[in-house]
Regions:
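Autoinhibitory propeptides
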Residues: 86-149, 157-158, 165-217
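Bacterial Sec-dependent N-terminal signal peptides
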Residues: 5-6, 16-40
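Bacterial N-terminal signal peptides that target proteins for export
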Residues: 1-9
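Phosphate-proximal small/polar/acidic motifs at interfaces that engage nucleotide phosphates
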Residues: 13
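Terminal targeting/pro-maturation regions of precursor/exported proteins
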Residues: 57-59
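Short, aromatic/basic amphipathic alpha-helical patches
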Residues: 73-80, 106-108, 156-161
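N-terminal, post-signal-peptide region of Sec/Tat-exported proteins
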Residues: 61-93
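Post-signal peptide N-terminal segment of mature Sec-exported envelope proteins
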Residues: 31-55
Length: 217
């Protein structure tokens, strides 16, 4: 993965350490094979000891197309105009509106193409006091830190359980791993990260979020 992207995700990591969710049953278009989006709003993350809610923004989403599915990406770009595109090594990542997502869903090709994409939601972070407000987008990635190097087998068991993949690991930070959900994953990155963190087996496990360039949305 490109260094700039890793550094960017590292900053995100420091902001959202300790993320937790009230419910893991529903998500918003995490599994593209589902017929309809399912709206679930009661997500939270811990920031400086305060549990801050994540409110689902139903109007925007992020479509991630694994590299190698070039025709899928081309059909998306020929049908809608993403308001921002994330440079990434493993996915073509397109920020789109809900109207664009509905337009894609109306196309004949989408029934098949939807099997080759990962769609993740946008959230509004608001502490209800006006002190912190940010719109963020859930990416396919999650960031995990082991307690000790010998826990790699434990991590592998979770990778197999959630059908994840390792996308980045540096020998300079042997305990830290960047994972991603795959087309076979049945849970969202947020659900996977929360459940891994709540297991108590890891120093941290957080879903990575993206922020479009200023003015992009």
């Amino acid at each position: 993965m490109k260094k700039s992207f890793i550094l960017w995700m590292g900053v995100v990591l420091m902001m959202v350490i300790g993320m937790s969710s009230c419910s893991s049953e529903d998500n918003f278009v995490t599994n593209p094979n589902k017929e309809e989006p399912i709206v679930q709003t009661d997500y939270f993350y811990d920031y400086d000891g305060i549990k801050i809610p994540l409110t689902l923004n139903e109007d925007k989403a992020l479509i991630s197309v694994p590299k190698g599915f070039d025709m899928v990406s081309e059909r998306i770009l020929a049908t809608v105009q993403p308001f921002y595109i994330v440079p990434d090594t493993f996915f073509d990542m397109f920020f789109i509106t809900r109207a664009d997502l509905e337009k894609l869903a109306s196309m004949d090709f989408w029934e098949e193409d939807a099997k080759s994409v990962i769609i993740t939601p946008s959230y509004i972070i608001d502490d209800d006091r006006g002190e912190f407000y940010q719109q963020v987008y859930l990416t396919p990635y999650l960031l995990v830190k082991l307690k000790k190097e010998e826990d790699i087998d434990l991590l592998t068991s979770y990778i197999e359980k959630y059908k994840l993949q390792i996308t980045y690991h540096s020998t300079y930070f042997p305990l830290s791993y960047t994972l991603s959900v795959t087309l076979d994953s049945e849970k969202s990155p947020l659900e996977c990260a929360n459940e891994m963190f709540e297991s108590g087996n890891f120093v941290w496990s957080v879903a990575s979020k993206a922020y479009p360039a200023s003015g992009a949305d």
